[in-house]
């Protein structure tokens, strides 16, 4: 049997080097990821890219342009702008984010690095924000699997099984139930608390593009929606899948009308089989949801609707880079982080600067159209 990738030496080829890294080496590595190997820097004040004056003791640079003279560090103008961490701690945080296949627990990283859980939460939130803004939304081609998975709003099992007699509702309210006294949770045979939890239920509709034979999924676009229906599925399909693609889904009614869009569409009835004899399946979506659910139960112990999209994008990134070596993951993510601007959603989070509301499908559709 072939060896799993996580058993290979490439999956751990950065850990030993990171254990011996110094503060100077950490700063040099972050500068390399941000500005390249030419020993030149881009001044955040005037934007001039050249070799600026180094202030070694303060670990900063001063702009060489006379009209500017702006002072900056390697983290200025990045998501880590105004941080109170050492450069090695920043590098260790990025490493901790990438090294776990199903995500990293805040308390586990906090104990490992000696940082407060608040600091880990805010900085991990900044990394997820970078992944959201850096998500590749170009329309998919080739074979594309589409499916929806339900998260959040999970009901809790009661201590005693609620068994409602068939005529219990009629005995209590008569033949016609008054609208003011109707209790839908009684009709559904659940507690009021569980009925209220259903309001937090969300659906993640994921589009996965197949790679070569045996390669599995190559790219994922997970979008959080209120329901799994054509109201959400059709606009997302138009925006993220090309008309010459071959789309495979399950038998859900949300996807039955895809042929009207001029797309070759095949469905598999999951009530009867996982895959048809012709090979029609949506197993790449099921693989994505399997990893995301394992993280929900085993790592994060639950998602919340407001930040469910952040976690979905994180797991999409992990799924797309599942075969990358350890140093490739760190290099790629660090370059992406230090190539972006300041954080808007997590800068000053513990001082009350919170993102308002959930990220919706309309947000991604507008971004794709821009």
Where are these regions (language model features)?
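Residue-level recognition of single "structural anchor" positions
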Residues: 1-370
